[in-house]
Amino acid sequence: YTLLVCAETMGTYRTMNICDLGYDDFTVISPLVGDPKVLVVGKDSKYNTLQELLDAIKENPGKITMSHSGPGGSGHNQGLVLKELGYEVAMTSFDSGNDALLGVIGGQVDFTNPNISTLGGYIESGDVKPLAVFSDKRMDAYPDIPAFTETVPEAEKYLNIPYTLLSFVVNNDTPQEVVDVLKAASEKVFADPEWTEFVKQNAADPVYDEYKDDASIQAFYDNWKSVICWLQYDNGVAEKSPEEFGIKRIGE
């Protein structure tokens, strides 16, 4: 049997008109981990807090620059969230997330929002200043970095989901007895202290702890699509309406 560890972007393939695949084409063994996004500026930036940066964006609409790795990606989605919240930034696309980060370190752009898995070393070296976790909660590994919603509470409806999520899935044709074995094996791994320490050391968000049964897993993915697919469509990024695929807006 072929197993797949997939990224969250599969939930947008249809609305982005990339291909006719979605979460419902697969059986989810478990969400794995989220890789939290952190809003950072360069070490020499004049901005020392999220509020200072947001004030500058308000005072200079469309002038403060934000780098990302391309339309439809998690970093770009966060730029769309800022837009929805009334913060107009100049979004600049780079070839990769790492290039987007180096653009900030090199002073080419004002800020970006990389994953913590690629950012930790730059925080430790002092090359960047982390202003906020792009989430509604702080990270255990970096408890001094405030959550974005501590400064902008109204962002909570967009930030109660992981923006970079890995999931463990199999084809829908996989026999149920095989799915059951894989789920049991996954639960055994998740309970292993070695795995728990690995997740902690990498500052990952243990999403698997929150969603264990099929109903909660389905609700999780439905909510993710409601947030992201409509966010992209309303901002002209997605080609097709989420309504075509039965994706409801938040709160519907």
What is each model feature region?
Residues 1-2, 14-99, 148, 165-198:
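Hinge/capping helix and adjacent helix->loop/strand transition within the periplasmic-binding protein
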Residues 2-4, 38, 110-111, 130:
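Short, Asp-centered acidic motifs that coordinate Mg2+ and/or phosphate
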Residues 4-7, 240:
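Short beta-strand segments
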Residues 8, 43, 116-117, 135, ...:
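Short secondary-structure boundary segments
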Residues 29-30, 154-162, 196-207:
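Mobile beta-alpha loop/short-helix "lid" or hinge segments that flank ligand
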Residues 63, 67-145:
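Ligand-binding pocket segment of bilobal, Venus flytrap-like solute-binding proteins
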Residues 120-190, 239-244, 248-252:
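C-terminal lobe and pocket-closing loops
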Residues 124, 177-252:
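An extracytoplasmic/periplasmic, membrane-proximal ligand-sensing/linker region
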